[in-house]
């Protein structure tokens, strides 16, 4: 199969190119793609447990623990014990973590606009539907 005929390779290459573009933009704020992905989850809902973040991000526990430690050290997030179960650590944004939401939202829009440049509005909608369906197929939904 030719490279251009392999959806998996093309999607992977697109994701990699978009991630590099986003990573380049985030670098000026000392944030990595993985850290930004966690911040996005916390912007949607603060106070998630590390296990919940692990599930949302599709990462293993050790990776999430390392991310949380680094992000705490950078002053992006803080951990607090769950009031009803002291064994559970809840993750909350700091002011610095909150402040990055609007800035990085612009970055995300720019990266997406760059990737979809030349697409009509209908093509964008159709492309996203196809990607969503392919993802659902792979996830068994």
Which role does the model predict for each range below?
Residues 1-29, 74, 95, 138:
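N-terminal leader segment of winged-helix/HTH proteins
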Residues 19, 24, 51, 69-132:
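Charged, amphipathic alpha-helical coiled-coil/dimerization segments
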Residues 38-39:
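Short alpha-helical "packing" element that flanks the helix-turn-helix/winged-helix DNA-binding module
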Residues 45-49:
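Short capping segments at the starts of secondary-structure elements
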Residues 54:
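The alpha-helix within a helix-turn-helix
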Residues 59-63:
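Helix-turn-helix DNA-binding motif, specifically the short coil turn and the N-cap/start of the second
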Residues 133-141:
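A short alpha/beta connector and helix-capping loop motif
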